Amino acid sequence: MTLDMDAVLSDFVRSTGAEPGLARDLLEGKNWDVSAALSDFEQLRQVHAGNLSPPFSGGSTCPKTPEKGGSDREPTRPSRPILQRQDDVIQEKRLSRGISHASSSIVSLARSHVSSNGGGGGSSEHPLEMPICAFQLPDLTVYKEDFRSFIERDLIEQSMLVALEQAGRLNWWVSMDSTCQRLLPLATTGDGNCLLHAASLGMWGFHDRDLVLRKALYALMEKGVEKEALRRRWRWQQTQQNKESGLVYTEDEWQKEWNELIKLASSEPRMHLGSNGASGGGVESSEEPVYESLEEFHVFVLAHVLKRPIVVVADTMLRDSGGEAFAPIPFGGIYLPLEVPASQCHRSPLVLAYDQAHFSALVSMEQKESAKEQAVIPLTDSEHKLLPLHFAVDPGKGWEWGKDDNDNVRLASIILSLEVKLHLLHSYMNVKWIPLSSDSQAPLAQPESPTASAGDEPRSTPESGESDKESVGSSSLGNEGSRRKEKSKRDREKDKKRADSVANKLGSFGKTLGSKLKKNMGGLMHSKGPKPGGLGSGSGISSGTETLEKKKKNNTLKSWKGGKEEAAGDGPVSEKPPSESVGNGGSKYSQEVMQSLSTMRIAMQGEGKYIFVGTLKMGHRHQYQEEMIQRYLADAEERFLAEQKQKEVERKIMNGGLVSGPPPAKKPEPDGGEDQPSDSPAEPKAMAFSTAYPGGFTIPRPSGGGVHCQEPRRQLAGGPCVGGLPSYATFPRQYPGRPYPHQDNIPALEPGKDGVHRGALLPPQFRVADSYSNGYREPPEPDGWAGAPRGLPPTQTKCKQPNCSFYGHPETNNLCSCCYREELRRREREPGGELLAHRF
């Protein structure tokens, strides 16, 4: 900050007693207009005094002022002029999108309220005492179609939604049971802190801008009482992964790895992006901080910070540009706060989505009074296989690393069986089985890697996954043939997991490596083992055993349906506890756990009539959330009306003032012109459901764009899928909007009826699909293009601006792109021609 701004901030803090962080937020929200910020401060204190504890109750050396003592401070208000600099404009832009950005002052009070509830990271207590909160979107179905589409593309991470739904990972349960609510990913800033942003959005509705969660995460890893237990769980899982790839760490290397994990969680920025970098909210900024990206272990630690389970919905494989899977994605699954007693934890899980190296919060939408839909999150995939339970094994303080790791007896004593995992889920969450109608069927998930089955965690503990399969495939009578079959199956699984682990370690090198890996290890990659249910190739003895067990379980399901839950739940397992499922210690689990085990086994054999889900508790909104949403909706309506007005102005410029008739470039559309024109009300909806995803970075804003360039921050760059590309293909990173106003009239890039590729007829500045692909780069300037006239459309002529040597086009009134932009700017400065005041 400059000296003047320091002085303004000091005066504001001295006159109000506000915390410096809150004072800065208020001043920045009003462009450093002190009078306006003071007015905001007084209004908020009076409105929210009964609901929010004063955010400046501690940590400030300035005396507190009475709640309604605004008149006492009136004479001390500074009479400085409004100060503004480029950084403040950037901050204002950054706070101009999304529900939490509608009123920075309200959110600042709420953030301060949250942070004031936290304790010291080094105390015996948890860094934060979290109330049970779950944010819900307002009911958008009450609004008109065009306005609803505008809000959806502003608030919802459309590309992530489409990608995960098409991959069969998200909302597949809605198609199986219409009483379940759809979950939607909220648009989240991609600055390296997206995990904590997503968690904060999912609970409170605003980003973790003050890094409250990140600081708590770091404190718990560095000096929390659970530090050593968390480290053992991490080292155990990492050791199993290292075994698969043949890696052996020394003690120094283990310490270095652990220190690196802690360092990643630090709240210190990694770097500052330049003017062409990707920053939160799509704003070019030289001061926007970027933080280190976090790993799956940090999700596990976050569950302990929040004292609540976390469920991450993600695809299981990373795919190259051709849709080929070449590396596993380890994030998907369940993270339980296992080092906190279940009685002290919230039982409603926080649900996050992960796609293309980016986290988002998954939230439901408010319902009408008459609606009976329930908010749930399945704990299995669409094939009824239990999701990975991450970092569930703690070998204990007495574990001798390097020695006990190779002792099969010791290993067998700590591997978790399916029964143990179900017991943990019942302990930490409110779970239930949702019955399905006879004709319902889950959409198939995307094809896995040639190695892994749908729910297997490629980087999770191999023994844990094998234990699941063992519990399902083995008879309750402990048949020897079944055990032999399981041993041979484990050998095959080990070979497959080895290939997966190698792909995981090296997969980031891209498509070429993935192709070579699969080519050179084809024997391993394509030798698929039996399904997780244990059905498939095997000895005659095991087949007979499976048939017997299958019949018994069918009877179990029928009796449960008839209401005899107690007898049916204990039936198949009460004859003899499953001794081959090690890790249960011989203890008998509750009736509910045994019922879940029986139903899970049946479901995993392809006869599932139920979905195993955790219930999501949706509490009442806090008053600050209600006001935050109402202000956002009012702000969104303003922007929507301004956008409609701008489209009308552009249409007049294009059709009335500059172009005498329909643009000739629109004529050769091969599909009968199915696309809507740019001013059609259907456009927001079409843009809202694009595919692919630009990753965890923000796409730079092209210069000179009008409101049509102001698409949501993480909108799809590549547009809808065309040609024969699969829906999960990764597209080049491009800006989603139209970089120049004339791009509305670009012909389709598919070959026309005459076989000529229409995009090839256009000069480079008019080619959208292949004009630029790097998300960090501004679109290339077209002004220097000087192609030969023989390649131009017949109507293209020299720019009509005197002394300009470039070519124009009828759609730009025969002006080159540079002169055309200058003409638009000139028109905007005329009365009635101003553009939107809001910029994303």
Curated annotation (Swiss-Prot):
Modification Phosphothreonine, positions: 730
OTU domain boundaries: 183-365
Gene3D superfamilies listed in its UniProt record: 1.20.5.4770, DNA helicase RuvA subunit, C-terminal domain (1.10.8.10)
Active site: 191, 194, 358
Comp. bias (Basic and acidic residues): 65-77, 456-471, 488-500
Regulatory loop: region residues: 187-193
Activity regulation description: Deubiquitinase activity is inhibited following interaction with PARK7.
Cited SMART domains: ZnF_A20
Family named by the database record: Belongs to the peptidase C64 family.
Function: Negative regulator of the non-canonical NF-kappa-B pathway that acts by mediating deubiquitination of TRAF3, an inhibitor of the NF-kappa-B pathway, thereby acting as a negative regulator of B-cell responses. In response to non-canonical NF-kappa-B stimuli, deubiquitinates 'Lys-48'-linked polyubiquitin chains of TRAF3, preventing TRAF3 proteolysis and over-activation of non-canonical NF-kappa-B. Negatively regulates mucosal immunity against infections. Deubiquitinates ZAP70, and thereby regulates T cell receptor (TCR) signaling that leads to the activation of NF-kappa-B.
Subunit structure: Interacts with TRAF6. Interacts with PARK7, leading to inhibit deubiquitinase activity. Interacts with EGFR, ITCH and NEDD4. Interacts with TRAF3. Interacts with ZAP70 in activated T cells, but not in resting T cells.
Protein name: OTU domain-containing protein 7B
